[in-house]
């Protein structure tokens, strides 16, 4: 005869079960949750000639949110965490009078140029102080540069200007970013850049690969009447100018001659 086995079943009352479930629920909701949010405040600085510089300094704000418990109520805590700040500088060309110029604001992290990173790029037509257009023509498998009068219905050639921060300190004759002068490269077509030939005192179009040579960089000066001038990086005091309806390198002896018409140029979106 088999012995009888007794089993006991502990019953949990409805009220007690609800209390247990509440405790478990409180434990789950008590866990913290972290979310990262990027914050990018913008700063503006107006330079002497009217050139407006916009800087954007980004950091991440990590928000720690503690979920509310049923007993203590809602608790909320925030703290800031600085992380991998990346600064972006954008040049607004109000000084040139070309605020409508098509602007490329894509991030340019081109580290191929030693110690220099491009700030931004603009696509614009280039003309002289007397409103003659700078044009480019392909002749015998090479590009020629002309200075000529165009008819009203003729389309102007465009040049891609890439802006860089130079190592030269800014002064009263020009504007800069963070105390440094701006440099530009000028490219009318892919893989071709304006190049200063100091030996021949000429301006030529050369096909170059990055890193670009120093002869392709020009220090930018903002002059009166919404004009700019381009000084050779490799030969200070020598500027891009106009001579016999062609671009040439012109020596400027003193700062008083920086306003000479044959070294002044205008930038326009049309």
UniProtKB/Swiss-Prot annotation:
Main localisation: nucleus
Tissue: Expressed at high level in high endothelial venules found in tonsils, Peyer patches and mesenteric lymph nodes. Almost undetectable in placenta.
This protein's name: Interleukin-33
Pro-sequence residue ranges: 1-94
Keywords per UniProt: Chromosome, Cytokine, Cytoplasm, Cytoplasmic vesicle, Nucleus, Secreted, Transcription
Region (Homeodomain-like HTH domain) residue spans: 1-65
Assembly information from the UniProt record: Forms a 1:1:1 heterotrimeric complex with its primary high-affinity receptor IL1RL1 and the coreceptor IL1RAP. Interacts with cargo receptor TMED10; the interaction mediates the translocation from the cytoplasm into the ERGIC (endoplasmic reticulum-Golgi intermediate compartment) and thereby secretion. (Microbial infection) Interacts (in reduced form) with H.polygyrus ARI.
Post-translation changes: The full-length protein can be released from cells and is able to signal via the IL1RL1/ST2 receptor. However, proteolytic processing by CELA1, CSTG/cathepsin G and ELANE/neutrophil elastase produces C-terminal peptides that are more active than the unprocessed full length protein. May also be proteolytically processed by calpains. Proteolytic cleavage mediated by apoptotic caspases including CASP3 and CASP7 results in IL33 inactivation.
Record Pfam families: IL33_bt
Localization (cell): Nucleus; Chromosome; Cytoplasm; Cytoplasmic vesicle, Secretory vesicle
Cellular component, GO annotation: chromosome; cytoplasm; extracellular region; extracellular space; intracellular membrane-bounded organelle; nucleoplasm; nucleus; transport vesicle
Similarity comment: Belongs to the IL-1 family. Highly divergent.
Signal peptide per UniProt: none
Domain remarks: The homeodomain-like HTH domain mediates nuclear localization and heterochromatin association.
Residue numbers spanned by region Interaction with RELA: 64-111
Site (Cleavage) residue list: 94-95, 98-99, 108-109
Expression induction or repression: By infection with the parasite H.polygyrus.
